[in-house]
């Protein structure tokens, strides 16, 4: 499979989870947009990724509806692990016409931050940090060199930004600003945009 355009990064820390992605939207060497948001809050969770932009948007809408349905039907909140497993099942259901996206999914349950990585066919991996997309090789190098479980949420945010900026310098399908989604240990979600 070819590398999917764009770059997204996720980091799990003791204080929370951080997801980040670049804004450039490109296909086949052509830049379609410089303002494509690829990190979204869903209920108490965050989702982000790289690949086909429409597929990532569709997955976000599908997950939003399924999480609401689960919580209404069961009269209790869905856990991060269960929501990630639900996303895995949805991706696998479409294996013959897959969503061409690599997805990062994060949340906090009872003060425990969690980060999951999913491929287009629904493989589900629990990880402490991850990078997906065409700029992942550069971003993961920065993460591996500087990640520590002792990082604060602010330091993790800075590491996310540094890894995405490094990928934007070396990958033509990455760039044009960064979206950051932070979920703190107490469940508060913060989103922000940083220009290039």
Swiss-Prot record:
The keyword Cytoplasm applies. The active site is at residue 7. Its main location: cytoplasm. The keyword Protein biosynthesis does not apply. It is found in: Cytoplasm. Keywords: Autocatalytic cleavage, Cytoplasm, Hydrolase, Protease, Proteasome, Threonine protease, Zymogen. Residues 1-6 form a propeptide. GO terms for molecular function: threonine-type endopeptidase activity. InterPro entries: Ntn_hydrolases_N (IPR029055), Pept_T1A_Psome_bsu_arc (IPR019983), Pept_T1A_subB (IPR000243), Proteasome_sua/b (IPR001353), Proteasome_suB-type (IPR023333). Transmembrane segments: none annotated. Gene3D superfamilies: Glutamine Phosphoribosylpyrophosphate, subunit 1, domain 1. GO terms for cellular component: cytoplasm; proteasome core complex, beta-subunit complex. It catalyses: Cleavage of peptide bonds with very broad specificity. The formation of the proteasomal ATPase PAN-20S proteasome complex, via the docking of the C-termini of PAN into the intersubunit pockets in the alpha-rings, triggers opening of the gate for substrate entry. Interconversion between the open-gate and close-gate conformations leads to a dynamic regulation of the 20S proteasome proteolysis activity. Component of the proteasome core, a large protease complex with broad specificity involved in protein degradation. The 20S proteasome core is composed of 14 alpha and 14 beta subunits that assemble into four stacked heptameric rings, resulting in a barrel-shaped structure. The two inner rings, each composed of seven catalytic beta subunits, are sandwiched by two outer rings, each composed of seven alpha subunits. The catalytic chamber with the active sites is on the inside of the barrel. Has a gated structure, the ends of the cylinder being occluded by the N-termini of the alpha-subunits. Is capped at one or both ends by the proteasome regulatory ATPase, PAN. Belongs to the peptidase T1B family. This is Proteasome subunit beta 2. It comes from Metallosphaera sedula (strain ATCC 51363 / DSM 5348 / JCM 9185 / NBRC 15509 / TH2).
